[in-house]
Amino acid sequence: MQERSFFSRHIGLRSDETQKMLDVLGLDCIDTLVSQAIPHSIHLGRVLNLPKAVSEGQALEELSKIMGRNHVHKSFIGQGYHGTCVPPVILRNLFENPAWYTAYTPYQAEISQGRLELLFYFQTLISELTGLPVAAASLLDEATALAEANAVAVRFAREKKTKISLQSLLHPQILSVVQTRAETQGISISENSEICSNTAAIVLSWPDTKGFFNDYSEVIKEAKAKGALVIVVADPLALTLMEPPAQWGADIVVGSMQRYGVPMGFGGPHAGYLAVSDALIRLIPGRIVGQSVDTKGRVGFRLALQTREQHIRRDKATSNICTAQALLANMATAYAVWHGPQGLQEIAQRIHSLTCRFMGGLEAAGIPCEGESFFDCVSVVVKGKAQEIARQAKAGGRLVRILDDDRVAVNFDELSTEEDACTLAQLFGAQLVDQVSPRLWGKGRDAAFLSQPFFHVVHSETDMMRFLRRLSDKDLALDRAMIPLGSCTMKLNAAAELMPVSWPTVANIHPFVPKEDAAGYQEMINQLNAWLCEITGFAQVSFQPNSGAQGEYAGLLAIRRYYQSRGENQRTLCLVPASAHGTNPASAHMAGMEVVVVKCLSDGDVDIDDLKMKAQLHKDRLAALMITYPSTHGVYEENIKDICSLIHENGGQVYFDGANLNALVGLTRPADIGADVCHMNLHKTFAIPHGGGGPGVGPIGVAEHLKPFLPGHAQNGTTHAVSAAPYGSASILVITWMYIRMMGAKGLKYATQTAILNANYIAERLSQAYSILYRGKHGRVAHECIVDTRVLKEQYGVSVDDIAKRLIDYGFHAPTMSFPVPGTLMIEPTESEPKAEIDRFCDALLSIAEEAKKVGAGVWPKDDNPLVNAPHTLVDTLDDAWVHPYSRQEAAFPNHHLDPTNKYWPPVSRIDNVAGDRVLICSCPPLGNTS
């Protein structure tokens, strides 16, 4: 029997359903719809030149052969990446569980309590390890975490101090990212320089890149005396045994949680962490989970202090970070819960003991080693034999790090065995000794840590399985229902696409292995580069950015460096439409550009007259226009080519925000439209799951003239890296490879057409009760539409928040709220949803409009109705004292489409956001501490 094509399973509509939707739109075929929606001037006019689509089985077999060309040696390289054991119970029940990986960022708190709770535990874990009171809910990686910390220090000094003094040796990849960030932010990075009045912070590595702990007591004392902050880059596993950095003066601590049960994956994705003192709370980048209460006083969690973030403060935000690494942070937290504090310390002690015995053996054999104090790494002096030692180690299936011609570093980890240590010692002509004293610096931890009950509840796999299930049951992800978030593209993340991520040949490769050992990765990445170049029309793609916002930053950096190479250093002005995503102005600011806002017209289009005036006014300084297409208003602007030409005529470059690329693939190409650079959200258009707030991948495609200015990497001797690993979150690139390989050109084009059809069908159905705010020339929308709900507020007092919360009772995640227009809903159905689910969603919104009318008619009071009281929990619905003027049935089962056997019950009622920010609680206090 012939296997069905993958794209017929990826796309939610059956052929008869497609025709029914077209009938509602009064159209005979989908091509007619596309021709009405998209300007004729940008139509591609040909089929993409991609390999013919193959089945799931064929794609898996092909990719397996490619990745089989990687050589999985045991890594002793270290340098920020370590072998770790992913507990199977976490691999199966979290990492490979769609209830966890298909969820969106938890902006809608009431339907996100499970992952918010686990992220709250993540923050608690980081606070306990570092001794600092507040931690972010993950950053993109260790290198960007330090770059963000440096920016925090400069902001804390109100930009009167701009020097960061590195007082110890950082890993080369971290140093490179820090230098890149500093270059455009007016920050001076100096190594081992004296602390002066202009020093905002000193940076200490704990341990440093050679594995050493140093006595920093004097330099910390000097920094404190001169008003400089102390930033520490710390290994979180070493911190289980050592005195928390806050106790010896740290104001900020950053690092990577990779070795807490997250595979190396050729560089990512991994969760960076950042913790700060109380004085720095409102300067912290990224998301923070805070504790609050719901309407009944029950504890609930929410994203706190959101006014710091880019979607609100735009170019004045603390950072451009949007997508972080929530899934990996949750994995690391689950790892800590699984092992508990004692288990973590046992792992750390075993690693340290093995390292000490290895070094003791070398010292006994007269082989010089550097450093007095260390945790897991030994730097061995070999006098010109480093290459030969590394070659011999590799011949035995082990990889060590070459520091220079005269020194190698051997880094032990959770997977290292006594046999490994013995064999490596023999390479140096030494034997492992039986027992030696610990070589950690300082007095160690003087008190219990992780005493909170949730780090002690798991004693068996049954406990862990149920712990993760209990949390995931609180959430609404794609495994339960459609998530119609505009500008987020919550499409299917197919099982076959995700399977390879767990393969040893994908997961267990260190990012700095010899090139020949990653031949499979290179081939896969080269193929993906070629495919994405064909899809977008660009000359080259960099996969280093590991989020869309970081892609924006990398693209703008390429533009800036291009102009610098031409001696046009003055070109630092960026035009940004008023309707742009918040990351656009935030990224421009981070890239050292001045942001000038361009007006939009009442129909949602860019105001060409205003654009022309500002482009000509600033033509000598113009660097770029950042533009989203289709626009954030959900329409294809007719004059997009003219807009691009106008910018080029005035000496600028066109930065194309690829957030809405799902409306373009196979139909047109950004480069053909006139773009010079574009980021692609692989976690939107190209099927990588959102993970509840990351991981994401935001590669950038560039035109030929910008190729020399793509991000480099210290490992290759090049500069301007934007993330720690050469290919960013490399291991999840296989998801996009699988997606494109199985869809083929025909499937990709049909997916885009179906996404446009679904959005137009929704717009048509909802226009019975709501105004569709923006439409194109022929009355069509793109792949998303903006529904104006302000009339319900004006006539009946029902807010967009009330509608969003009421949708939970109907079993839905709310669409994007109040962007780009306050009081509206932006709806994006994607191509993956079946017609029945789309109809169920439309019915829900139409029913809510009828409920609002009842409020307006006085059937229900404005202060006591199903909308203002939404969402309704099971406990509240069963309450003996039901005092509302509407029935329990109307509260919990508001229309006949709700299946009582498949009902989603929110665990909390509406969360009090004001209370959560007024009394900020970002971690759980230790047992016995109620302060």
Swiss-Prot record:
The keyword Cell division does not apply. One of its GO terms (cellular component) is cytosol. InterPro entries: GcvP, GDC-P_C, GDC-P_N, GDC_P, PyrdxlP-dep_Trfase, PyrdxlP-dep_Trfase_major, PyrdxlP-dep_Trfase_small. Its cofactor is pyridoxal 5'-phosphate. Keywords: Oxidoreductase, Pyridoxal phosphate. It catalyses: N(6)-[(R)-lipoyl]-L-lysyl-[glycine-cleavage complex H protein] + glycine + H(+) = N(6)-[(R)-S(8)-aminomethyldihydrolipoyl]-L-lysyl-[glycine-cleavage complex H protein] + CO2. The glycine cleavage system is composed of four proteins: P, T, L and H. The glycine cleavage system catalyzes the degradation of glycine. The P protein binds the alpha-amino group of glycine through its pyridoxal phosphate cofactor; CO(2) is released and the remaining methylamine moiety is then transferred to the lipoamide cofactor of the H protein. HAMAP family: GcvP. This is Glycine dehydrogenase (decarboxylating). The lineage of its organism: Bacteria, Pseudomonadati, Pseudomonadota, Alphaproteobacteria, Hyphomicrobiales.
